[in-house]
UniProtKB/Swiss-Prot annotation:
The keyword Cell membrane does not apply. It is a single-pass membrane protein. It comes from Entamoeba histolytica (strain ATCC 30459 / HM-1:IMSS / ABRM). GO terms for molecular function: transmembrane transporter binding. This is Antigenic protein P1.
Length: 1113
C-alpha cells in the first residue's frame, strides 16, 4: 500500500457519482418474546452507550411545519345551489331511483369539472348541510370551529407518488404557493378522499352508494395547458363543495426536495413513520378536524376515513407495524421509490378487494379500515386481507422472471410474504390453545403441517413454503424466495433439468439447496411430483432428510425459535403428546421424552406420552421444557428436539356441571346443588358457557370468574340463555343479583326485564361474578353481552345500544390475584429493515480551483497540448461542468500517448478516482495511473485501465492511497479520435457502512445543536449548531470505521473531529455531490485500534455545520 491510513478531512466537488445504497439486514432474536433466556445473539457483544445500528431509521419522509394559525372567522362559505331535494351522505337511510341517481351523478360531475373556474370567479360553494354536506367521508359532521392554518410542506423529491398534506374545509379555498419559477411538469394537486382521478370512481348507477356523493375527489395536473392558466405568480388555488384531504403528487422528474406553502387548511389525522410521536398524536392530531386520515411509511400509505382512527392511542406502533409489513417484501422481492397506497373505500370492483399492481395502489372495502389501526387485533389476530392486497405488488413483476411459486404464482407470492409477517410480528400463535382458524394457521409449525400429515389437501402450496420458516427460520424462507431469481437463473435450471420455474420439481430442488436438506420426503407428503432427474440430483447432494414433525405445545424446531408460549389454564391440565404432535401416521417406534423442564408444577404420568400437569407458578411466571421426538420413518431413525414455554391463561374461566337437576325453577336448582359434588368441569374463554348438550338430562352449570373492563364508565350488561340464567356480580364487596332470565332467550333484549341492567364500573378492577345456567335438556348455552355508554350517567340510553359479546379480554379466572398482571406481549423489533437510502458515499479530498490557474494550489506539471487558451489546468478542478481542459484537435490533433501530471501542495488520501468527460466519444481510452510513494519518492504504477466509451470514469482502490503527485499516461481516445478532454477530475474517499445511527439518537451527546425540520432527513430533522462556531456532537463507537453524513449547503462551516482526545485537522464541511445527503468525513482505524471503544466528537470551529446520520462498520 502507498501511504498510510489517517483521519481524512473534506473539501467539495461536483455531482455525478452514483448514490450508494447499502442494504442493511438486522437479524434479531425473539428471546424477549419467546421468554427463552438461552436464546442469545452470538454475533454481537453489548457495550453500554456505544452507538449501534438503528433499524427503525429511514430517510424517505416528507415534513410539515405549521407557520401560523388563526381562529375561524365564524362565517361559513355560501351554500351551493343544488338542483334536487335529496342526496346521499353517511348513513342517510334514504333510497334513490335509478333516474335520481343518474341526475345526481350528472350534476356532481358538472360541478366538479368546473371547480377551477368556480374558484377563479369566486363562485365556489359548499354542499348544504340539509343535504348531507357535513356528512361526507363517513363523518357525522365538520368541525368548523377548528383553527385555519398556514403550513410549510417539505417534499422529499427522491420519493414520488401522492402524499396527504392537510384538510380543506367544505367550500373554502386553499391557496398553494410553490417555489418561484419551478417547473410544474410532474406535479399534481388533489382534493377529496382517496382516488384523485374521476376515472377511478364509479359513476355507474348500478354501483351507487347511499353513503356518499358519487364524485368526492378530483385532481389537477399542474403541468397541463388546461391547468396552467390558473397558476398565477406560482400560486394555485383549490377547493371542493365537500372539502377533503389536500394531496400533493410528484413523479420521477424531481430528485431534490422543495417546499410548498398551503394556506387556509386544517390539520388532519396523519401519522408519519418515525416522525409522529404518540404525544403529538394524542394531543394534536388524533382529534384534528380532517375527516380523512393517512398513515404513511417509506414503503406504504394507508388512506382511510378519520372515524376509523379516532380511538387509536399508539400511533407509533401502527406506523411501525405497517413499515415492518412492507419491509419484508422490500427485502425479499423488490424495492421501489413510491409507497404502495392502500385505499379503504366503498368502491371495489373485483372480489372483496383488488390490487392495481401496475398503478401501485390497492382498493379495499371501507369496513376493513378499523382493523388496520387496531393494535390489539393486529397483535392477536393479524389482518390478512389488506396485507394480502399490499403484497400483490411484490409478486416479482419488476424482477427477472416475474412471479414465482407453485401453480398459482401471483397468489403464492403475496401469501408467503404475509405469512412471514404473521410469524415475526404477531402473537397469533400465543392463542393456539384455543385453536387457529382461517389464515392464522401459518403462524404455528404444528398448525401449518397437521392437515398435510392427515392427508388433507388444504392449501398445500402455501403450507409447503411456510413450513420452511418454522423449521429453519424466516431467513431461510426468504432465501428460498430469492433463489427463484438467483440460483434458478445462475445455474440455468430450466435448461439443465427441463423443468419450469413454477413446477413442484423446481420447489423441491430449490428448497433442498437452500435448507441443505433432502426434500424428497417432504415433497412426498405434499404429493408433489418430482421429475426423476431432479430427484436423483437431490439424492446426490447427500443432505440429511428433512422430517417436518411438530408438537403443538412447542415453539422451536431443532434450535430454530419460531413460535410463542403456549397458554394453559389454572388448575390441572392434561398433556397428551401423542394427540398434539403432527407426525407421519406410518412412523414406527414413536416416543416422546421430556428431556428437561416442567419443574414449576406437579407432573404426573397417566400413560405413555400422557401426563397431568398442575402449575404452581403465577400469572407473571412461566415454565419451560425440552421435548425429544424419536421415531422411525422409512427405515431411518428420526430425532427432533423441540422446546416450549407454558404460561397461564388468565382469560380462561372455569365452570362446574351438576347433572340430574330435576327442576325448571332457578331457586330450587340452587338448593339442589348446595350439597352436591360437581359431575364434570369445563372452561370458557368468554363471559358465558358455550354449547352444552346434556341430552335428555337436566343440568345446572355454575361459572365463576372476574369481570374487567377496558374503560371506566357506565355499562349495560345483557344476558341470553337456553334455558334459564342468573348473574351475580360483586361490585360493592357483596354479590348482588344483577340479571335473571326465567325463560329461553335466544338473543339480547333491550326491553325484557331482568335480561339487562346498567352498572358503573372502573377500569382494571376485577369484579367477581357467579353465572348460573339451568339447562332443562338438550343443547344449552348462556352468554353475557355489553354496551358502553361513556363516563356520564346522562349518556345512558339502552335503546341505542349496539350489544357486543363479552370476550376473553374482559374476563379473568377467579384465581388471578388482585393486582397481578398478565405479561404484556413484547412487540418484536424489526428484523428486515428498510435500507437507509439515497446516500452519496463519497467526498472529495482535493481542493477546488475556483479562481484560475494562478490561484490554484494544484499544479499541472505536464499536460497534452491544449486546443486554445480557454483550456486551463484549473478547469479540471473547479466543480464546474461547463469548463474543461481540451487537448488539441485541429491540424493533426493530439499525438498519443499524452501525459497528465498533477502535484498537490500537501499529501492527499483517496480510494476513489472520478473523471468526467464532455461526451462519451471525448473520453480517455487505455491509460495507466502512477502515484508518488511518500516513502521512496518514486513514481509507482497504481492502475492499468481500459476505459470503455462513456462520459464518466470511476475507479475504486482496495486500500487508501496517500500521495502528493499523480500521473496519467493516456494511450488513446476511447472512440479512436485524435483528442481527449477532461471536464472534472476528483480524488475522493468513498466508503459504505453496515450500520447507521440518527444524529439525535439516544446515545449521541449533543451540545449546542438543534433540530431543523428537513425532508428526507432521518426522523425529519437535521442536527444544526445553534450558534456559529459553537457546538459538538459526541458518541462512543466500537467499530473499524465510521463516517459522517450531512446535507449539502451552498455555504458551510468548519469543524474538527477529535478521537480519544486527539484533535484532528480543522476542515470545511463540503461535499462531493449535489445529492442532498452525502458523506463528508470518514475515518478508518488501523488494525491495533479497530473494534476498541473510542470516544469521538465532532466539534464546530467556524460557521454552521449540519449532521444527519453516522455510518459505522
Amino acid at each position: 500500500m502507498l501511504g498510510s491510513k489517517s483521519i481524512i478531512a473534506v473539501v467539495a466537488i461536483a455531482s455525478a457519482i452514483v448514490t450508494g445504497v447499502v442494504v442493511i439486514v438486522v437479524v434479531v432474536t425473539l428471546s424477549v418474546v419467546l421468554t427463552r433466556s438461552s436464546v442469545k445473539d452470538t454475533n454481537s457483544i453489548y457495550v453500554p452507550d456505544v452507538i449501534t445500528n438503528d433499524p427503525q431509521m429511514t430517510n424517505e419522509m416528507d415534513t410539515l411545519e405549521v407557520i401560523s394559525s388563526s381562529k375561524f372567522s365564524g362565517t361559513k362559505p355560501k351554500e351551493w345551489t343544488m338542483k334536487y331535494t335529496k342526496y346521499p351522505y353517511w348513513r342517510c337511510g334514504l333510497t334513490f331511483t335509478n333516474e335520481e341517481k343518474q341526475n345526481i351523478v350528472n350534476e356532481n360531475k358538472e360541478y366538479m369539472n368546473s371547480l377551477l373556474q368556480l374558484i377563479n370567479n369566486g363562485s365556489l360553494g359548499r354542499m348544504p348541510e340539509k343535504y348531507g354536506g357535513d356528512k361526507q367521508f363517513e363523518a357525522n359532521g365538520v368541525n368548523w370551529e377548528a383553527d385555519r392554518l398556514e403550513v410549510r410542506y417539505g417534499l422529499f423529491g427522491r420519493v414520488f407518488g401522492q402524499r396527504a398534506v392537510a384538510w380543506a374545509f367544505p367550500g373554502e379555498i386553499v391557496t398553494i404557493k410553490f417555489p418561484k419559477g419551478m417547473s410544474y411538469k410532474g406535479i399534481q394537486v388533489g382534493i377529496g378522499k382517496c382516488n384523485h382521478n374521476p376515472s377511478d370512481q364509479w359513476l355507474n348507477v348500478n354501483n351507487w352508494s347511499n353513503d356518499r356523493m358519487p364524485i368526492d375527489s378530483i385532481g389537477f395536473d399542474l403541468g397541463l395547458n388546461t391547468t396552467q392558466p390558473y397558476i398565477i405568480n406560482d400560486t394555485f388555488k383549490i377547493g371542493s363543495p365537500f372539502g377533503g384531504m389536500i394531496y400533493l403528487r410528484s413523479d420521477t422528474t424531481f430528485t431534490n426536495s422543495f417546499y410548498v406553502t398551503f394556506s387556509n387548511v386544517g390539520r388532519a389525522p396523519i401519522i408519519n413513520y418515525n416522525i409522529t410521536t404518540n404525544e403529538e398524536w394524542n394531543s394534536v392530531l388524533r382529534n384534528a378536524p380532517g375527516n380523512v386520515a393517512e398513515i404513511r411509511t417509506p414503503g406504504n400509505r394507508l388512506v382511510l376515513t378519520s372515524r376509523n382512527i379516532r380511538s387509536l392511542e399508539d400511533a407509533q406502533y401502527i406506523s411501525d407495524f405497517w413499515l415492518k409489513a412492507i419491509s419484508i417484501s422490500n427485502y425479499a422481492v423488490t424495492l421501489e421509490n413510491i409507497p404502495i397506497t392502500l385505499n379503504f373505500d366503498q368502491r371495489v370492483d373485483a372480489g372483496a378487494a383488488v390490487a392495481y399492481v401496475g398503478r401501485w395502489f390497492t382498493q379495499n372495502p371501507s369496513d376493513w379500515a378499523a382493523a388496520c389501526v387496531g393494535k390489539d387485533g393486529l397483535i392477536n389476530y393479524g389482518n390478512w386481507g389488506p396485507l394480502h392486497e399490499m403484497n400483490h405488488h411484490m409478486q416479482g413483476t419488476y424482477l427477472k422472471g416475474g412471479n414465482w411459486g407453485i401453480s398459482n404464482p401471483g397468489e403464492e407470492t403475496n401469501n408467503v410474504m404475509t405469512s412471514i409477517n404473521y410469524i415475526l410480528y404477531t402473537n397469533i400463535a400465543g392463542h393456539r390453545n384455543q385453536g387457529l382458524s382461517g389464515w392464522n394457521y401459518v403462524s404455528d409449525g404444528y398448525s401449518t403441517i397437521y392437515k398435510i400429515l392427515k392427508g388433507e389437501n388444504d392449501q398445500p402450496h402455501l403450507r409447503s413454503y411456510v413450513n420452511m420458516a418454522h423449521a429453519f427460520g424466516t431467513d431461510t424462507l426468504i432465501a428460498l424466495v430469492k433463489s427463484y431469481y438467483g440460483l434458478w437463473y445462475e445455474n440455468n435450471f430450466e435448461s439443465k433439468y427441463s423443468i419450469k420455474r413454477d413446477s413442484t420439481s423446481a420447489f423441491c430442488l430449490l428448497a433442498a439447496l437452500v435448507t441443505k436438506r433432502d426434500t424428497r420426503y417432504l415433497c412426498s407428503l405434499f404429493k408433489y411430483d418430482i421429475q426423476s432427474n431432479v430427484s436423483e440430483a437431490i439424492k446426490n447432494m447427500n443432505y440429511p432428510t428433512y422430517y417436518p414433525f411438530f408438537n403443538l405445545y412447542a415453539m422451536s424446531y431443532n434450535g430454530n425459535y419460531y413460535g410463542r408460549p403456549y397458554k394453559i389454564p389454572y388448575g390441572r391440565t392434561r398433556l397428551n403428546f401423542t394427540a398434539t404432535t403432527a407426525i407421519d401416521p406410518k412412523a414406527t417406534s414413536v416416543s416422546y421424552t421430556i428431556k428437561s423442564g416442567l419443574t414449576k408444577g406437579k407432573l404426573e404420568r397417566v400413560e405413555d406420552n400422557v401426563y397431568d400437569y398442575t402449575p404452581f407458578f403465577g400469572i407473571e411466571e412461566n415454565d419451560t421444557f425440552v421435548l425429544n421426538i424419536d421415531c422411525v420413518v422409512n427405515g431411518e431413525k428420526v430425532h427432533i428436539e423441540q422446546e416450549g414455554t407454558f404460561e397461564l391463561d388468565p382469560h380462561q374461566v372455569e365452570y362446574e356441571v351438576y347433572k340430574d337437576v330435576q327442576t325448571r325453577d332457578m331457586a330450587q336448582a340452587l338448593n339442589i346443588i348446595q350439597n352436591k359434588t360437581a359431575n364434570d368441569t369445563g372452561r370458557a374463554s368468554f363471559f358465558g358457557i358455550g354449547t352444552y348438550n346434556d341430552g335428555s338430562m337436566q343440568s345446572m352449570l355454575v361459572e365463576k370468574g372476574k369481570l374487567i373492563v377496558p374503560k371506566s364508565g357506565y355499562y349495560t350488561l345483557f344476558m341470553k340463555a337456553d334455558d334459564l340464567g342468573r348473574l351475580l356480580l360483586n361490585i360493592t364487596g357483596e354479590y348482588e343479583q344483577l340479571l335473571d332470565v326465567k325463560t329461553y332467550l335466544g338473543g339480547y333484549s333491550k326491553t325484557l326485564n331482568g335480561s339487562y341492567a346498567t352498572v358503573k364500573l372502573e377500569k382494571d378492577v376485577g369484579y367477581p361474578f357467579i353465572l348460573y345456567n339451568l339447562n332443562t335438556g338438550g343443547q344449552g348455552f348462556i352468554r353475557i353481552g355489553y354496551c358502553y355508554h361513556g363516563t356520564e350517567e346522562s349518556s345512558v340510553d339502552v335503546s341505542k345500544c349496539s350489544v357486543s359479546d363479552i370476550g376473553s379480554s374482559m374476563v379473568l379466572n377467579e384465581k388471578v390475584k388482585t393486582g397481578a398482571k398478565e405479561p404484556e406481549f413484547q412487540i418484536p423489533p424489526i428484523k428486515y429493515s428498510r435500507p437507509t437510502r439515497f446516500l452519496t458515499n463519497a467526498y472529495r479530498t482535493i481542493p477546488k480551483c475556483l479562481n484560475g490557474d494562478d490561484a490554484c494550489s494544484i499544479k499541472c506539471l505536464s499536460l497534452p497540448l491544449k486546443h486554445d487558451d480557454s483550456s486551463k489546468c484549473s478547469n479540471m478542478f473547479d466543480d464546474n461542468y461547463s469548463t474543461m481542459y481540451h487537448s488539441r484537435w485541429t491540424g493533426q490533433g493530439t499525438t498519443f500517448p499524452v501525459n497528465y501530471t498533477f502535484e498537490f501542495s500537501e499529501n492527499v488520501t483517496f480510494n476513489n478516482l472520478y473523471v468526467h468527460h464532455r461526451r462519451p466519444e471525448d473520453s480517455w481510452g487505455y491509460f495507466e495511473m502512477f502515484v508518488k510513494s511518500p516513502e521512496t519518492g518514486e513514481m509507482e504504477l497504481l492502475e492499468k485501465y481500459k476505459h470503455p466509451k462513456s462520459t464518466t470514469t470511476e475507479l475504486n482502490f482496495q486500500k487508501l492511497v496517500t500521495t502528493d503527485r499523480v500521473q496519467f499516461i493516456v494511450y488513446n481516445n476511447s472512440n479512436g479520435g485524435n483528442y481527449v478532454n477532461v471536464v472534472e477530475l476528483s480524488f475522493n474517499i468513498k466508503e459504505t457502512f453496515k450500520n447507521y445511527t440518527n444524529s439525535f439518537g439516544p446515545k449521541i451527546k449533543s451540545t449546542g445543536f438543534k433540530k431543523v425540520t428537513t425532508p428526507g432527513a432521518s426522523g425529519g430533522y437535521l442536527a444544526v449548531n445553534e450558534k456559529e462556531g459553537e457546538g459538538s456532537l459526541c458518541f462512543k463507537a466500537k467499530v473499524t470505521k465510521f463516517g459522517l453524513y450531512g446535507y449539502r449547503k451552498t455555504t458551510s462551516g468548519k469543524f474538527r473531529v477529535t478521537i480519544d482526545s486527539q484533535p484532528g485537522e480543522v476542515t470545511s464541511q463540503s461535499y462531493f455531490s449535489d445529492s442532498e445527503r452525502t458523506l463528508f468525513y470518514a475515518h478508518t482505524f488501523d488494525e491495533t485500534e479497530a473494534n476498541k471503544v473510542h470516544n469521538i466528537c465532532m466539534e464546530v470551529v467556524e460557521g454552521t455545520v449540519n449532521l444527519d446520520i453516522i455510518g459505522s462498520s
